[in-house]
């Protein structure tokens, strides 16, 4: 089966990604080695130039009409590949002359300039313009969410220009490398996908801002664990093949790396021995005191291990491993090229020592191991805090476990030996004097006689004092029991808090240290917003070919429609549905969950847009009041003649937003009242609806031609809503009238009152109507009595 154009483009994108990754790695390689074997580089460069001259112009043309994440990304990638490969080629030519590696790296890595900042100015009105500074991927995503909320107030041409500048900034931030640099994103700033994920789970009574605090975003950049340290040495040994035989020193280095990676500390080996000793005991076994103590200490040691992660690599091992890998690289370089390798990571290598390797990083250390080491070092530093003395007892616990195991092995191991020993101890205790031995056996831990002697002395002293309460109650013993219980509870609570804190911080360190790939969130947002502005831009060109109803209609027709609507009232049961329509037209094109398989209502999409844009609560309240609407037309009919979507003398963005909301509310409610009054089914559409648009009024958001009336194969434009409604009446009358009597609405208004409806039916039997025939007199009369017996044009019931 032949591939379509989209599939072919995906294949080309995959190959370009592979080439981009190789070129990005080439930036950090020794230029002397690259110059020796540059055949593949130049061959790929020729292919990139060919794609740039043939495919790139087509992508730019496509993105000027309709965008997608793939076409936008391909445009960025081809432009970046072309510029990068040209820069590397010129830098290699320059290196052949001056032989200065540092100069080469500064040019290729662009260390002497910074082009990762952008200031964008958006003009909303002649006296209202805002400037936004951008420096990270998070800033781009947040700006697009804000533009989505003021979508109707931004000019279409300006919106497309802003999206193009944002795309250019994304290209500079990401370059051609799929791995995101740590300076181009902020992991603690959430995106709109983080918000949508939180909305899918119960909020448990917490606000969205509180739930998003401390949340790490894994959408703008996606965390990937790509390297496993334990597998590196084996994989390198397999790749080298015969080199290990011809270069004996290489084989010895690999053997040292393997032994270093497999090393694990032996200080906690007694835990395994303790578990083996405890495995022979069950619920029905007689448990000796030593076994009970061994189980108790093993439990506490595991509790400590739940907090302190004992990793298989220490700081010294990390430095030794880095040194061994560096030596291996040098040996391979001498074998292949006859000289030492000096890449960008070699510069300043001797300056780092101690724990600095963690913070600088190593190309030979797996990120997961570094994360474990940072966690372990943090816990060791935390253990030095005297407020948590329990953590200092870890070594004592292991020492006690060791001594118990040695005692058990000395007298015999297993349940049988333990039972015999227990019986012997019980017999000796009974023979020695009864109650003291029984008390020690019952106490499990009170194996010595000093505590019993001290308690007996205290009781005797209390009895001598004559306190009757102390004769039947040991207060000192109860105080000690309560004290131990309290300390245990506080200790458990402290451990839980420490574990939660460490777990959260470990997530942050993992996000920072591991490889993060650039996500598609920003490109998705740019594509949606840009497609909306492109649709509006196309509608401007198309509207110029449509007749303007203002050329044939005037202010009288405008007043005629208003006078027929202003005394009516909307049915209150329609307000919830109309409120949803208001939210639909106020919201931008970024959140379209009403098109999902399981669609969400328009108000939920609007809530997503407001929360991600950071709209203040009192502004949200104003929006809700606007969308709730009223049944009285005088409350929403505020737009003047020929003034729809024309905003003058606006100096505050909040005022501009409210005016946009008011215009959209008037559009939705006036059309609904028009349908109720005149018995029509006039629909409303957004300009972004595309092929789904049918007959009705199309909102373009453009001040030049904000409204377009489509009726069959004819379309009209206007800046006045009520002129379009009058035109719709006229077009409907022409459709229903006979072919020989196509009079205008104004002429039909002068016709005498027709006879009964029954006499009119004979002239309309051959006319196909969309709705059930009914008495139009009741439709057009003023039901509130304000209009008396006045009627609307007779054309409505012909």
UniProtKB/Swiss-Prot annotation:
Report residue spans for region: Disordered: 416-458
User: According to the lineage, what is the superkingdom?
Assistant: Viruses
SS bond list: none
Q: Which GO terms describe its molecular function?
A: ATP binding; zinc ion binding
Cite a GO CC annotation: host cell nucleus
Mainly localized where? host cell
The stretches annotated as zinc fingers (C3H1-type) lie at: 191-219
| Amino acid composition bias (Gly residues), ranges on this chain | 430-452
- Binding residue positions for ATP: 674-681
Q: Where in the cell is it found?
A: Host nucleus
Tagged with keyword Ribonucleoprotein: no
Q: Which UniProt keywords apply?
A: ATP-binding, Host nucleus, Late protein, Metal-binding, Nucleotide-binding, Viral genome packaging, Viral release from host cell, Zinc, Zinc-finger
GO biological process terms held by the UniProt record: viral DNA genome packaging
Q: Which Pfam families does the record cross-reference, listed alphabetically?
A: PRTP
Q: Which InterPro entries match?
A: UL28/UL56
Briefly, what is this protein's role?
Component of the molecular motor that translocates viral genomic DNA in empty capsid during DNA packaging. Forms a tripartite terminase complex together with TRM2 and TRM3 in the host cytoplasm. Once the complex reaches the host nucleus, it interacts with the capsid portal vertex. This portal forms a ring in which genomic DNA is translocated into the capsid. TRM1 carries an endonuclease activity that plays an important role for the cleavage of concatemeric viral DNA into unit length genomes.
Into which family does the record put it?
Belongs to the herpesviridae TRM1 protein family.
Subunit structure of this entry? Answer: Associates with TRM2 and TRM3 to form the tripartite terminase complex. Interacts with portal protein.
Q: What is this protein called?
A: Tripartite terminase subunit 1
Q: Which gene encodes it?
A: TRM1
């Amino acid at each position: 089966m032949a591939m379509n154009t989209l599939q072919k483009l995906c294949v080309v994108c995959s190959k370009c990604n592979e080439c981009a990754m190789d070129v990005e790695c080439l930036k950090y390689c020794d230029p002397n080695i690259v110059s020796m074997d540059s055949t593949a580089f130049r061959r790929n460069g020729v292919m990139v130039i060919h794609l740039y001259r043939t495919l790139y112009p087509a992508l730019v043309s496509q993105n000027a009409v309709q965008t997608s994440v793939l076409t936008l990304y391909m445009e960025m990638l081809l432009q970046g590949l072309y510029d990068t490969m040209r820069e590397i080629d010129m830098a290699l030519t320059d290196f052949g002359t001056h032989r200065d590696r540092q100069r080469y790296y500064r040019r290729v890595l662009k260390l002497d300039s910074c082009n990762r900042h952008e200031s964008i100015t958006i003009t909303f009105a002649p006296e209202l313009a805002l400037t936004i500074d951008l420096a990270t991927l998070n800033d781009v995503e947040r700006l697009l969410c804000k533009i989505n909320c003021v979508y109707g107030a931004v000019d279409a041409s300006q919106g497309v220009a802003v999206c193009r500048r944002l795309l250019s900034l994304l290209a500079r931030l990401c370059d051609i490398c799929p791995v995101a640099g740590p300076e181009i994103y902020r992991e603690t700033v959430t995106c709109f996908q983080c918000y949508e994920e939180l909305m899918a789970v119960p909020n448990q009574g917490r606000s969205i801002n509180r739930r998003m605090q401390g949340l790490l975003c894994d959408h703008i950049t996606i965390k990937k664990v790509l390297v496993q340290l334990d597998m590196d040495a084996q994989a390198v040994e397999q790749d080298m093949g015969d080199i290990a035989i011809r270069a004996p020193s290489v084989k010895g280095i690999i053997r040292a790396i393997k032994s270093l990676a497999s090393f694990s500390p032996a200080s906690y080996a007694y835990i395994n021995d303790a578990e083996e000793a405890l495995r022979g005991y069950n619920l029905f076994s007689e448990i000796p005191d030593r076994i009970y103590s061994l189980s108790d200490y093993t439990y506490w040691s595991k509790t400590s291990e739940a907090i302190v992660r004992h990793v298989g690599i220490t700081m010294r091992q990390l430095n030794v491993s880095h040194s061994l890998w560096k030596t291996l690289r040098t040996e391979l370089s001498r074998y292949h090229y006859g000289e030492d390798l000096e890449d960008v990571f070699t510069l300043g290598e001797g300056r780092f020592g101690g724990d600095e390797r963690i913070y600088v990083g190593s190309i030979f250390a797996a990120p997961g191991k570094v994360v474990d080491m940072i966690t372990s070092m943090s816990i060791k530093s935390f253990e030095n805090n005297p407020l948590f003395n329990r953590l200092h007892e870890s070594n004592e616990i292991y020492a006690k476990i060791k001594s118990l195991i040695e005692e058990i092995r000395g007298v015999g191991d297993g349940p049988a030996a333990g039972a015999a020993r227990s019986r012997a101890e019980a017999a000796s205790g009974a023979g020695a004097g009864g109650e003291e031995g029984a008390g020690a056996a019952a106490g499990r831990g009170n194996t010595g006689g000093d505590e019993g002697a001290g308690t007996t002395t205290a009781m005797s002293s209390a009895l001598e004092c004559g306190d009757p309460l102390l004769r039947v109650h040991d207060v000192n013993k109860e105080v000690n029991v309560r004290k131990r219980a309290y300390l245990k509870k506080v200790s458990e609570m402290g451990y839980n808090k420490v574990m939660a804190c460490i777990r959260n911080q470990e997530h942050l360190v993992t996000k920072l240290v591991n490889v993060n790939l650039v996500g598609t969130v920003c490109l998705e947002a740019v594509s949606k917003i840009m497609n909306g502005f492109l649709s509006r831009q196309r509608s401007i060109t198309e509207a110029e070919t449509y007749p303007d109803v203002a050329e044939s209609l005037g202010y009288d027709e405008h007043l005629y429609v208003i006078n027929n609507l202003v005394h009516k009232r909307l049915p209150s049961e329609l307000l919830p549905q109309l409120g949803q329509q208001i939210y639909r037209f106020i919201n931008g094109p970024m959140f379209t969950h009403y098109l999902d398989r399981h669609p969400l209502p328009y108000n939920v999409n609007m809530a997503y847009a407001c929360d991600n844009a950071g709209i203040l609560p009192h502004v949200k309240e104003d929006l809700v009041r606007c969308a709730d609407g009223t049944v009285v037309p005088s409350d929403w009919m505020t737009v003047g003649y020929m003034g729809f979507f024309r905003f003058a003398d606006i100096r505050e963005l909040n005022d501009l937003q409210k005016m946009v909301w008011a215009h959209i509310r008037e559009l939705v409610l006036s059309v609904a009242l028009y349908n109720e009054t005149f018995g029509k089914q006039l629909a409303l559409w957004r300009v972004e609806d595309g092929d789904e648009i049918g007959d009705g009024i199309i909102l373009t958001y453009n001040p030049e031609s904000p409204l377009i009336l489509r009726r069959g194969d004819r379309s009209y434009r206007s800046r006045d809503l009520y002129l379009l409604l009058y035109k719709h009446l006229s077009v409907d009358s022409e459709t229903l009238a006979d072919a020989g009597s196509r009079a205008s609405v104004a002429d039909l208004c002068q016709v005498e009152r027709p006879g009964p409806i029954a006499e009119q039916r004979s002239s309309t039997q051959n006319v196909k109507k969309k709705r059930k025939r009914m008495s139009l007199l009741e439709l057009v009369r003023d039901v509130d009595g304000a209009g008396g017996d006045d009627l609307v044009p007779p054309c409505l019931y012909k």
